[in-house]
A protein has these predicted regions:
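Charge-dense, helix-prone N-terminal extensions
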Residues: 1-108
Length: 108
């Protein structure tokens, strides 16, 4: 049984809240996940998830077909650490959410 985009996002939210100090919130008007310090590390927009990633995880996510850097202003100024991963790769969303959580937690 395949999930719809919103349901797939909600499954990631439920799992992250159950397994890490995570809360749901808003960022740029979109639903997002934040760590216990209130730092956003993932979000949901237009049937895709966005993740704040670094290193190999960033490169891996960006290399997926249809993925791109997140540009919330839509003015050609993408946020270099944030990658949009479309629904077609939703089977990887939880993996990237965990990587993003760790990346934000360990960022100096």
């Amino acid at each position: 049984m395949s999930l719809e985009p919103q349901a797939a996002y909600e499954a990631v939210v439920s799992e992250m809240i159950a397994t890490s100090p995570t809360a749901s919130g808003k960022m740029f008007g979109m639903p997002c996940l934040k760590n216990s310090n209130g730092k956003a590390f993932a979000g949901y927009t237009e049937s895709a998830m966005v993740f704040k990633l670094g290193g190999p995880s960033h490169a891996e996510a960006l290399a997926l077909p249809g993925s791109n850097l997140f540009d919330p202003s839509e003015r050609g100024r993408p946020m270099k650490e944030w990658v949009v991963v479309p629904f077609e790769h939703s089977s990887r969303w939880l993996e990237f959410a965990r990587d993003a959580f760790d990346y934000v937690a360990n960022k100096k």
